[in-house]
Amino acid sequence: MSDAVTIRTRKVISNPLLARKQFVVDVLHPNRANVSKDELREKLAEVYKAEKDAVSVFGFRTQFGGGKSVGFGLVYNSVAEAKKFEPTYRLVRYGLAEKVEKASRQQRKQKKNRDKKIFGTGKRLAKKVARRNAD
């Protein structure tokens, strides 16, 4: 894994509204399958003098034949800004947020349909009975 990897950034735009720099990342990786996003985040953090957690990379496509990948990168001014503006699924990937576990689709539908069966005054009474039974 000691093969040289070259990272170039182009189309660098400073986005003050979202407190970040955004750019296209070109990665040259000859004699190597690909470069991990984690490794790219580390190297970009060095280049832009930012924390690794404030750097986000995504959308990488490897050219046919390998050796070159192109993707998109974001460097936020701070980790707090990254947590504020980045989508939750990316924060989960980077270990900055917990994944929200929700009931399965089938369970949600079954609950919705159960709730539809009781309505009006009966619904009020059903809630009252459920509360009384819970105590």
From Swiss-Prot:
Q: What is its main location?
A: cytoplasm
Q: Which residues carry this modification: Phosphoserine?
A: S14, S56
**Cross-link named Glycyl lysine isopeptide (Lys-Gly) (interchain with G-Cter in ubiquitin), sites:** K21
The alphabetized list of GO BP terms reads:
cytoplasmic translation; maturation of SSU-rRNA from tricistronic rRNA transcript (SSU-rRNA, 5.8S rRNA, LSU-rRNA)
Its cellular-component GO annotations read:
cytosol; cytosolic small ribosomal subunit; mitochondrion
What GO MF annotations does this protein's record show? structural constituent of ribosome
Do the record's keywords include Ribonucleoprotein? yes
Question: Key word Electron transport present in the record?
Answer: no
Basic residues bias (residue ranges) = 105-115, 124-135
Tell me where it resides: Cytoplasm
Keyword annotations of the record: Acetylation, Cytoplasm, Isopeptide bond, Phosphoprotein, Ribonucleoprotein, Ribosomal protein, Ubl conjugation
Residue numbers bearing the N-acetylserine modification = S2
Entries under InterPro entries matching the protein? eRP_eS24_sf, Ribosomal_eS24, Ribosomal_eS24_CS, Ribosomal_uL23/eL15/eS24_sf
Describe PTMs of this protein. N-terminally acetylated by acetyltransferase NatA. Also partially acetylated by NatC.
* Residue segments, region Disordered: 102-135
According to its UniProt entry, the function of this protein is described as: Component of the ribosome, a large ribonucleoprotein complex responsible for the synthesis of proteins in the cell. The small ribosomal subunit (SSU) binds messenger RNAs (mRNAs) and translates the encoded message by selecting cognate aminoacyl-transfer RNA (tRNA) molecules. The large subunit (LSU) contains the ribosomal catalytic site termed the peptidyl transferase center (PTC), which catalyzes the formation of peptide bonds, thereby polymerizing the amino acids delivered by tRNAs into a polypeptide chain.
Q: What else is known?
A: There are 2 genes for eS24 in yeast.
Outline the subunit composition: Component of the small ribosomal subunit (SSU). Mature yeast ribosomes consist of a small (40S) and a large (60S) subunit. The 40S small subunit contains 1 molecule of ribosomal RNA (18S rRNA) and 33 different proteins (encoded by 57 genes). The large 60S subunit contains 3 rRNA molecules (25S, 5.8S and 5S rRNA) and 46 different proteins (encoded by 81 genes).
- The family this protein is said to belong to: Belongs to the eukaryotic ribosomal protein eS24 family.
Know the name of this protein?
Answer: Small ribosomal subunit protein eS24A
Organism source for this protein? Answer: Saccharomyces cerevisiae (strain ATCC 204508 / S288c) (Baker's yeast)
